[in-house]
Amino acid sequence: MTTPYKHEPFTDFSQEENRKAFEQALGKVTETLGQTYPLVINGERIETKDQIVSINPAKKDEVVGTVSKAGKEEAEQAVQAAAKAFETWRYTSPEERASVIFRAAANIRRKKHEYSALLVKEAGKPWNEADADTAEAIDFLEYYARQMLELAKGKPVNSREGEHNQYVYTPTGVTLVIPPWNFLFAIMAGTTVAPIVTGNTVVLKPASATPVIAARFVEELEQAGLPKGVVNFVPGSGAEVGDYLVDHPKTSLITFTGSREVGTRIFERAAKVQPGQQHLKRVIAEMGGKDTVVVDEDADVELAANAIFTSAFGFSGQKCSAGSRAVVHEKLYDQVIERVKEITETKTTANPLSADVYMGPVIDQASFDKITDYIEVGKQEGRLVTGGTSDDTEGYFIHPTVFADLEPTSRLMQEEIFGPVLAFSKVSSFDEALEVANNTEYGLTGAVITNNRDHINRAKQEFHVGNLYFNRNCTGAIVGYHPFGGFKMSGTDSKAGGPDYLALHMQAKTISEMF
């Protein structure tokens, strides 16, 4: 009998012993940098001429690893391997499938700091963000394995005299997993494990910016006893390999986390029935957000300022849940802005080699250029409060940047920037605050800072987001506690880490037997 699920605790880096342990892990990981990682198709290692080089965004001359790059030929091999493995894996008992995932979780937990240290190197994550990413990866494994054991029981339906009816779940087939680079361990692991534990097989195309952690995770699954072909590792370009895999007639399910642009493209392509295709493809998508922290007129200023700061600048604002918009009542507007400015200017932006660094780099040159362009837009649309500076000499560093006095329809208030840029907008009433909070095409997360119970109840009904928080930041969803997924153009509201998520990877089957 399994123990009840409880989320993996975060590491307290104020404790000297924890800091030393993490420093040792960083040293150990640094010694392994520069290794090469082949494709994995049907358990076979395949090296290709074309390669993807993963670099440390905090230190551009440091190569984290080199990964073989798949083309259409390798993508085809991966799909065929997954399709073949599906014919046996689908009949493997839920208990056996879950046991593989439990073993992988236990192994990762034993090497938790090493995995987190790799995230520091490959994505430039500060220690606490890397630690939370690894903890969430473990949580996904532990939670989904338990959920599968429950789902295996089926759901009760009525039976009549002389008739026995069952309602059970069966897997769908080959699943294409396209995870993002920002939660390079947690989301990659969660979206890979969910189809596996439900009896599907996987073709994993990791983010090109962060493929090394995915290669390591595939190794971990193999060591836990996952059979050949159940997961196939094929890094490659979205335009070539991604489109090919989305279009493939044997692809049954696509799970994607990334931009609105790519997500809608996947939806469009997946809807077209290809020659030889015998099913309608499902798409599970999370496509970003433009998330708002609303501050009511009776709010605690210190609480509001800290919630806004944390929401906006955790992991350099590179979260789909990042609170990049602060909508503040005019009575507290100036006070809140000033306090956010004070907090922001005490934080360190640097290579996250110590626990004292609050913010590291952005992920790559393209992101750096995009974000700095938005900062220039912000200077035209609003008032620069603090930040606005950047340096890509050694790494891709942008200081946390705050703009005030933005119009609700301005670009900084409407477009997902995915960087450390925060926009403030002033409102004169709670009605207006809700109107502004809902005025984007996204609906992922949001927060309301208020002591007004009537306003809380109104926001529960009228603030149209998938994850709504009160009197706290709008980031940091925990598996099993805050199932995650959004409305509108934020995606399919699939609620990762929730009780309904695994069923999206399966088909319900009704069985009726007469006696």
From Swiss-Prot:
Transmembrane segments: none annotated. It catalyses: L-glutamate 5-semialdehyde + NAD(+) + H2O = L-glutamate + NADH + 2 H(+). Pathway: Amino-acid degradation; L-proline degradation into L-glutamate; L-glutamate from L-proline: step 2/2. PROSITE patterns: ALDEHYDE_DEHYDR_CYS (PS00070), ALDEHYDE_DEHYDR_GLU (PS00687). GO terms for molecular function: 1-pyrroline-5-carboxylate dehydrogenase activity. The keyword Ion transport does not apply. Its EC number is 1.2.1.88. One of its GO terms (biological process) is glutamate biosynthetic process. InterPro entries: Ald_DH/histidinol_DH, Ald_DH_C, Ald_DH_CS_CYS, Ald_DH_CS_GLU, Ald_DH_N, Aldehyde_DH_dom, Proline_metab_enzyme, RocA. GO terms for cellular component: cytoplasmic side of plasma membrane. Pfam families: Aldedh (PF00171). The active site is at 286, 320. The keyword Oxidoreductase applies. Keywords: NAD, Oxidoreductase. Gene3D superfamilies: Aldehyde Dehydrogenase, Chain A, domain 1, Aldehyde Dehydrogenase, Chain A, domain 2. HAMAP family: RocA (MF_00733). Belongs to the aldehyde dehydrogenase family. RocA subfamily. This is 1-pyrroline-5-carboxylate dehydrogenase. The gene is rocA.
